[in-house]
Amino acid sequence: MDGREAMAFPGSHSQFYLQRGVFTNLTPSQVASGLHAPPPPPGMRPMSNPNIHHPQASNPGPPFSMAEHRHSDFGHSIHMGMASPAAVQPTLQLPPPPSEQPMVKKKRGRPRKYVPDGQVSLGLSPMPCVSKKSKDSSSMSDPNAPKRARGRPPGTGRKQRLANLGEWMNTSAGLAFAPHVISVGSGEDIVSKVLSFSQKRPRALCIMSGTGTVSSVTLREPASTTPSLTFEGRFEILSLGGSYLVNEEGGSKSRTGGLSVSLSGPEGHVIGGGIGMLIAASLVQVVACSFVYGASAKSNNNNNKTIKQEIKPKQEPTNSEMETTPGSAPEAAASTGQHTPQNFPAQGMSGWPVSGSGSGRSLDSSRNPLTDIDLTRG
């Protein structure tokens, strides 16, 4: 308020002048006349127009009421009421205290797959394990229940599968398979060339195929090894096959087996059978493979074991000789009569006459300085 303001009250109540919290009591007659009003207290100005009437003077109301509108920033309101000019009672309404939530510390790192209450936090459905628990409980309750065997089931190995075909198939499994290409020149015998190649090593040889032309072929009967028919001309090799296996009873170069061939003549006739001799008309290439089967592999292992056993006894004396001390070497040489590099025999000295034992001793004593040295002296 600037200066003072006049507030009129209905009825016979007096009018008050407000100036910064200071109230002045005036009668209605004084307010109406405006002339007989007592002088204002020092520091207060009189009203410029005393005939101003407050519009609320005609309306009956409470003796005194002041209200402030609720501010948007405050959640409470202030009400002031006065039944009389001397009674003023302010009322305050405080808002309820806000509820505090517990502080939760943020966890760092990768989220856990399983939360502490047992639920899956990543949305993964757990595997049902009821059947496994039931099986375990049944096996624990029943001690006579058969236990599950560990390892490979019996009868599923390679040897067991080969045993169904017979003992020969079980022992003839090849090892160290190696392919070969045999070249046969013009005019050479293909059979003799392949047989000599198989005799170089104690390995079985299997003929896979052959390509080229031949000028002469000698066929033999199946039941005998002697040739029976001979064909001459130019023939194309259609197929060539056979094998040479090592004969253990006949030696390392003894072989069992043979070759068979199918040839096509110039007119389209096909001849073939077991061959005794096959002469090449041009370069012929034979594809073969060699391998070591069970019998020869066992013999090779036995030979290696015997060789190792022979080598070990020879190495033991050398180790014992290296352990002898150098101080005992001269005494051992003198006791056994071994000749050192400085002790030469009398027979080896040609040109020196040997008449008796005395001259021989003098020669030995002059040549061997070890006899004059006393090893016990310092």
Curated annotation (Swiss-Prot):
Residues 171-314 form the PPC domain. Residues 316-327, 335-345 have a biased composition (Polar residues). It is found in: Nucleus. The keyword Nucleotide-binding does not apply. InterPro entries: AHL (IPR039605), AT_hook_DNA-bd_motif (IPR017956), PPC_dom (IPR005175). Residues 30-70, 88-160, 302-378 are annotated as: Disordered. One of its GO terms (cellular component) is nucleus. Residues 104-113 have a biased composition (Basic residues). Keywords: DNA-binding, Nucleus, Repeat, Transcription, Transcription regulation. Gene3D superfamilies: Hypothetical protein, similar to alpha- acetolactate decarboxylase, domain 2 (3.30.1330.80). SUPFAM superfamilies: AF0104/ALDC/Ptd012-like. The keyword Membrane does not apply. A motif (Bipartite nuclear localization signal) lies at residues 105-113. GO terms for molecular function: minor groove of adenine-thymine-rich DNA binding. Residues 105-117, 147-159 bind DNA. Transcription factor that specifically binds AT-rich DNA sequences related to the nuclear matrix attachment regions (MARs). Interacts with AHL29. The PPC domain mediates interactions between AHL proteins. This is AT-hook motif nuclear-localized protein 5. It comes from Arabidopsis thaliana (Mouse-ear cress). The gene is AHL5.
